[in-house]
Each structure stands twice: as structure tokens, then as C-alpha cells.
Amino acid sequence: MNLSKIGQFISRRRMAMGLTQAQLAERLNVTDKAVSKWERGKSLPDVTLFSRVAAELRVSVVELLSGELMNVVRSSNLDEAVDWDGKAAQATPLTLHRDDPADLLVSPYLFGCNLEHTRSCIYTGLSAQMVRNRKFAGKPTACEGCAIEWFPLGERGVFALDEPYTRHGEGYHMKRTLECNSVGIFNPYCGEAVGMGQHGITISQGQPYLFGMVVKTQESVKFTVSLTDRTGKNVYCRATSVGGGDDWTRLEVELTPQAADSDADLRICWENAGYVCVGAVSLLPKDHFHGMRRDVVEAMKDLGLKVLRWPGGNFAGEFNWMDGLLPADMRAPFQSYLGLETQPHTMGYDFSEINTDDFIALCREIGAEPFITINPCWNTPDENAAWVEYCNGDVSTPYGKLRANRGHQEPYNVQFWSLGNEFGYGHMEGDNTPAGYCQIALENGKKMLEASPGLSLCSSGPYPNKEWAEFSAKPLAGIS
């Protein structure tokens, strides 16, 4: 692939279109410096831009990468004459030669994706979890006392938020509010049904679902769990479970609806008098993959991703990896630093549904190399080094032994690690000066390399920016 030839081709086509470098850059949402580098043969557009660059230059992607126009039939949206004789002309075969010293080897990891563990990327996206606000984060509704996204059942039940079942793991240092709650429901009259429900559950006919609920009660209680229409009159399926007690107990039933409904209700009720505390609720398709949707996992596999970055993105600045060592129901929600980003999706909170083990399982399933972003603002260098050890250490190390005890004997051997995300911008917490970030990144990177020498570390910062290049990228060159 001749970068110089491609660059000259881009330059000729741009001028033929009557565009300046700045105008082309604006259309592609890149910097004019990036366009200049393409035209000088110093780099190529990102692979995700190939189609857009070709469209702006009124050429095909094949022509763009070959650096020359070809005798092919063009779509009517390409402002070129069409040589049309009733049959499509045969495209000229394209041969790429690596005989130019300026050519670059294309990395097998060129095509990747950023899996940000937040918003609709997870809820209604990758996560198979069907219940919204399943751990009752945030303030309750003003009039009813029921958690947001839930509605009360029964005429005389009393609702209040109570001491939580959820909690954060070790290494949690962030300052957030209303992340951990449970819902307490008092029924003053035996024989009268009380409970809680949620609208807007999408169910498929004949599809089995796994329901789970963590409760604490004054005595053994018979719970009835139903999937119904929005009115509650048409019951698609129903199951009961008896349990409870002074300690938190997880109750489980399987539900298989006899009809499909894109706006079904999940309803949980009981008739025992007394107090019931609900710590978490879960509803998953029985065929889920580590808590993830099978159809989305298969689609990711079909994409052919070769590297997958997680947990972000901006969310990496909220994430505490040690929370993932807790059971999924017990992991506390995260209140977003930028609530405006998550408010339309999950009311300002994110729910820690996927942990490190799940992410590695996903990467192996789709054939992608894992690329993990640490949280250098809220986790210490030792805590981030422990994450590396959990992934790459053998059973002789404390965290390698912990991974093995959790059912994963062999190290994950995660090679690629990002030292934070987008430092230098106001939407990320922490020291956003070049020198300040550099110091944090150095401290974390050195500890991580002690835990697993030979890692490929990626530093963060705004690009292009001379100050960051001088006072951050250069000093970090020894480790990243």
C-alpha cells in the first residue's frame, strides 16, 4: 500500500471537489492537520473513515486505497460521468504491493471497538438484564415512596428506602450519593396483597426467563411473581416461592410466558402481614451468556472485532474493578460524574452488570483481544496493579490465586492496558494538567509493570496538543 500515492490522490480529488483541507476536515469531523498528514503520505485515515472519505471525494473505497480512478460504473450519487451500456463494467483487479519503504505494516488489531459499560450500550444493549433500576438507586418517588421505575401494588402498603443489600468492594474511594438502597414494604393487614411492579418489560412467547430476588423478612413469606399485561388482568405466567428470614436470602423462579408482549408488567406480591425488605431484583433470559444477550454477542462475533476496550471510555473513571468480585446482585450502582450523560438512559446511575471475568469470556467468545482501561483517579497504583495481577498472575500470586479460586485457573494474559481515559478534558475527574496526569500515569504504569512485565500501556491526553506531547507523552515514552 503506497501511502504517498494515496496521499497525492486525496489531494487531487479534494482540489477537484473545490475543497480546502480545512473544509474536508470539517466534513469528516477531523483536524486539518490530520488531512495534511494524509496528503503528505504520513498516515492513512482511520479505517472507520474510509467510506466517508471516499464519499466526500466521490470515489470508491477501492479507488481510494489504490490511489487512482478506475473504469467502473459509479453510483448516481458520485458526481462523475457513468459509462453505462446496460451491463455493469468489470472492476479492475487491485493488487497491493509492499515495496515502498514508506509503507506501514497494518496491525491485526486495527479493527476494534470501545465497549463503554454505561447507558444504552449496556442497558437494552449488551446486558441481558431486563429490569430497570433493579437495585433501587436514587431518590424514591415523592408521593408513593417507591423506588424510581417501580410502582406499588396494594392499597395499604407502606413503602420506604432501607439499609442496602448492595455495597462496593474494596478500593472504592469515590464521593457519590444514593447509590445503595433497598426497598422496605410494610403490610399492616394479613390477607391483603402488597408488593411492587415494573412496566415496559419485553417478553417473547415460550422463552424461559430466570427471576431472582434478594429479600429479608420478619418471617417466612410466600411470594407470587407474575408476568402480565399492563393492566395486570391478563397473566402470561406465574410462579411462587417461599422463603425469607433475618438474613438476606435469594429466591429464584423460572417464568415462561404463553404470549409475547413488548409492554408487559413484572409483578411481585405477597399477603403476609409484616415487613419485607427487597435488596435487588433480576430477570434474565435463560440462555444469557455471562449476563449478556446472546444475539448481541453473536452480532459482535460477526463483526470480526480483533480488539475490545472496556470498561470505557468515560465510564472507566467511575468503575471500581474490585466491585466485580462481588455477586452481580450485590454490586452497588455507580452514580455518574456527568449525570446528564446517563440521565436519559438509566437516571444518572450505572449498574455494574459485567465484571472482569465476564469481559474476558466475551473477548474469547468473539475472538477479540482484551484492552482494559484503569481508573487512575479513584484507584491507587497498588489497586490497579492488583487488577493486572488478577488478570495475569499465576496461582502463586495473591490475586492470581483469587482468580483461580473463582474458577479461572489459567491467567488471562491481558496485554493491552490504557492508563485512564481522555485526561486533559473537563469531563474526566482527576489532575487534567499534562504534568499532573504524567505523574499519576507513571506511578500506575510502573506498579502495573512490576505485576506483569512486558505490558503494552497506552497513555491518555488530548490530541493534537504540543503541551501534552512535551510534558506528558515524552516523559511517558519509557513505559507507554
Language model features by range: what are they?
Residues M1-A16:
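A short, Lys/Arg-rich alpha-helix, primarily the initiator
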Residues G18-K37, R52:
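Short alpha-helical DNA-recognition segment
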Residues L28-L44, S66-L69:
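Recognition helix of helix-turn-helix/homeodomain-like DNA-binding domains
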Residues T48-E63:
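DNA major-groove recognition helix of helix-turn-helix/homeodomain DNA-binding modules
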Residues S60, L78-S352, E369, A385, ...:
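Extracellular and organelle-lumenal recognition/adhesion modules and their flexible linkers in secreted
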Residues A264-I268, N272, T433-S480:
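Noncatalytic carbohydrate-binding groove/subsite architecture in carbohydrate-active enzymes
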Residues E271, P311-G312, T397-T433:
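Active-site groove signature of glycoside hydrolases
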Residues G279, Q409-H427, G461, A469-S480:
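Aromatic- and acid-rich polysaccharide-binding/catalytic face
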